[in-house]
């Protein structure tokens, strides 16, 4: 998915701009008659409060109370956007663009993009009660298929129960249709396809099944550097493996410029060799970087550790290898690489090539562990990296033995993706070692799509669960795994193998990850319109936005964020409320989101019907 550059956009016509005011022409009239932005602000405030009062007094009628609720919420959003104080926080005035553009100011019209137009078109529809949000994204289709909505005021008892059950069956039929778009690695068709892929790779590398299923062979033969590029080229030449010239060139450019690239042979066999970039799109985009990412990493080659440290770990590390953002838990990073390097990694600024140099040495690790021993506030330790399961069993045991001596530590959590990228790393010996630890121990992983869930993953999870170790999933909700019901398909696959949905992360808003970002509204939409259709035990994941230096911020409601501005390109500007609010003094964080229009365009490019996402505009 390629995002347009600013120069590729066409200037919005004045007529197109004026059309957005048709649901509420009074707003346009106020802008036209106002001699200044401040005059417009005051008159718009008065208009909005009068409109709100008319709604609250019941003088404006709505077909559905949901549309009434949305109108009031949209008015609140508009008042937020025209607020003088919010302009100070955002660093610019959305109202000024509206006012100037309505006056026909050519410079303002040149800056305004379709995303801006669409935001206000939908906002004014919502304020006027004409958004038709109450029909829902499935309502139109259900009506077209002759499905009747249940009115419990008209039918009662068993008749109502049967009617409701039949209605919900129809909803599930549509839900199942969506889910079927995303094959799981547990599907027989996919299992057979990957068996053939494995056989092809075994023949190519000249190895047996025994070697393939040995994690040490997998680690030793990670495709990295120019040698890895050469292997991919040779595979394309002598087997049925397909990869585009563009991707090969981008990978080569990355490694030549010192950008770490790593791909385990196991994860490579998850690719669709013969029909690439369709069912395996998410898998490929996990490891194959887009051009924008590579260019940005090269641009900041000398200051990468500062430019891309989105979470401000330099400011939250009391000692080498330790990061602390919370009261009772901190991170230790004993290995600074992974057998497979994910493009969207938040620690791309510190991740090294997968080799011995990524281990910082026992002296540093022991000093970091001493820090935990000295701080009795640390009741849990998160061992992450990089990937700590890149280390030997002996190294892992050595760290656990040291932690076992710390009476104040209640539990340990390992953060690893080897369960997905090299599941053979979870040997009986490692599982038993972890299970023998006398304190509470759990594992968090990153499964990104149901296509990654395989029989090998299921076997790895089984070994851990047999030793009373629970595995939790932290899903990064990036652009390539954000289609309708894609995360629902993932949750179902996770539950099948015994992994518990834990967090769904908004991807870190890092400039180099532009091609992976989604609007916050899409995550909110997914939770409300898709995840909600699953049983509660399947949707145990919390939607999360990470605030730099402060950490996880829930995306539940307006107590967590405020929409305070819309930029000319259609980007929403949010004021994020950190978890510390209400506990002690803290500062709020201003974040510029990816434009919804830009995101929808990217979905359209891969064949999605963006009409299916039309309610996204109403998640503020």
Swiss-Prot record:
Segments crossing the lipid bilayer: none
Chain positions with N6-(pyridoxal phosphate)lysine modification: 552
Keyword Methyltransferase in annotation: no
Record-linked Pfam families: Radical_SAM
PROSITE patterns: RADICAL_SAM
MF terms (GO), sorted A to Z: 4 iron, 4 sulfur cluster binding; catalytic activity; metal ion binding
Binding site for [4Fe-4S] cluster: 338, 342, 345
InterPro entries linked to this entry: Aldolase_TIM (IPR013785), Lys_aminomutase/Glu_NH3_mut (IPR003739), rSAM (IPR007197)
Keywords for this protein: 4Fe-4S, Iron, Iron-sulfur, Metal-binding, Pyridoxal phosphate, S-adenosyl-L-methionine
Cofactor note: Binds 1 [4Fe-4S] cluster. The cluster is coordinated with 3 cysteines and an exchangeable S-adenosyl-L-methionine.
Radical SAM core domain location: 324-586
Needed co-factor(s): [4Fe-4S] cluster; pyridoxal 5'-phosphate
Family: Belongs to the radical SAM superfamily. KamA family.
Protein name, as recorded: Uncharacterized KamA family protein MJ0634
């Amino acid at each position: 998915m390629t995002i347009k550059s600013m120069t590729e956009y066409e200037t919005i016509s004045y007529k197109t701009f004026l059309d957005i005011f048709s649901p509420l022409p009074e707003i346009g009239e106020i802008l036209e008659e106002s001699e200044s932005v401040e005059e417009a602000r005051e008159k718009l405030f008065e208009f909005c409060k009068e409109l709100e009062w008319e709604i609250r007094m019941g003088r404006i009628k709505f077909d559905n109370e949901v549309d009434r609720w949305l109108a009031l919420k949209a008015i609140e959003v508009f008042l937020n956007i025209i607020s003088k104080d919010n302009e100070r926080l955002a660093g610019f005035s959305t109202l000024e663009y509206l006012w100037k553009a309505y006056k026909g100011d050519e410079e303002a019209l040149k800056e305004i993009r379709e995303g801006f137009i669409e935001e206000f078109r939908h906002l004014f529809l919502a304020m006027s009660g004409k958004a038709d949000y109450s029909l829902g994204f499935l309502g139109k289709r259900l009506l077209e298929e002759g499905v009747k909505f249940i009115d419990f005021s008209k039918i009662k008892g068993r008749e109502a129960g049967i009617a409701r059950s039949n209605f919900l069956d129809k909803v599930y039929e549509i839900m199942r249709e969506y889910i079927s778009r995303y094959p799981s690695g547990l599907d027989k068709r996919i299992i057979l396809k990957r068996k053939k892929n494995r056989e092809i790779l075994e023949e190519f590398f000249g190895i047996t099944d025994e070697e393939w299923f040995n994690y040490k062979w997998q680690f030793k033969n990670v495709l990295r550097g120019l040698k890895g590029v050469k292997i991919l080229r040779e595979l394309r030449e002598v087997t049925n493996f397909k990869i585009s010239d563009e991707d090969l060139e981008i990978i080569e450019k990355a490694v030549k410029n010192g950008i770490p690239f790593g791909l385990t042979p196991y994860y490579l066999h998850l690719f669709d060799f013969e029909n690439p970039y369709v069912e395996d799109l998410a898998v490929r985009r996990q490891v194959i970087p887009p051009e924008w990412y590579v260019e940005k990493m090269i641009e900041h080659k000398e200051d990468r550790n500062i430019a891309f440290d989105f979470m401000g770990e330099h400011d939250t590390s009391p000692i080498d290898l330790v990061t602390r953002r919370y009261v009772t838990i901190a991170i230790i990073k004993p290995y600074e690489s992974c057998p497979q390097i994910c493009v969207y990694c938040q620690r791309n600024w510190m991740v090294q090539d997968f080799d011995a140099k990524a281990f910082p040495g026992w002296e540093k690790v022991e000093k970091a562990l001493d820090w935990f021993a000295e701080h009795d506030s640390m009741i849990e330790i998160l061992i992450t990296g990089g990937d700590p399961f890149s280390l030997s069993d002996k190294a892992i045991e050595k760290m656990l033995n040291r932690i076992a001596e710390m009476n104040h530590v209640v539990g340990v959590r390992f953060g690893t993706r080897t369960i997905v990228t090299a599941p053979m790393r979870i040997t009986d010996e490692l599982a038993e070692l972890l299970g023998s630890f006398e304190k509470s121990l759990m594992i968090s992983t990153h499964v990104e799509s149901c296509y990654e869930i395989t029989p090998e993953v299921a076997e790895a999870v089984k070994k851990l669960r047999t030793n009373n170790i629970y595995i939790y999933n932290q899903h990064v909700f990036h652009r390539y795994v954000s289609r309708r019901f894609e995360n629902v398909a993932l949750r179902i696959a996770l539950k099948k193998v015994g992994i518990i949905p834990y967090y769904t992360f908004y991807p870190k808003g890092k400039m180099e990850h532009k091609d992976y970002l989604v609007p916050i509204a899409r995550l909110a939409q997914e939770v409300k319109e898709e995840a909600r259709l699953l049983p509660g035990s399947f949707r145990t994941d919390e939607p999360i936005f990470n605030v730099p230096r402060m950490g996880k911020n829930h995306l539940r409601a307006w107590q967590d964020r405020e929409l305070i501005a819309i930029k000319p390109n259609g980007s929403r500007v949010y004021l994020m409320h950190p978890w510390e609010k209400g506990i002690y003094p803290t500062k709020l964080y201003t974040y510029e989101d990816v434009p919804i229009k830009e995101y929808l365009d990217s979905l359209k490019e891969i064949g999605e019907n963006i009409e299916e996402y039309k309610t996204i505009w109403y998640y503020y």
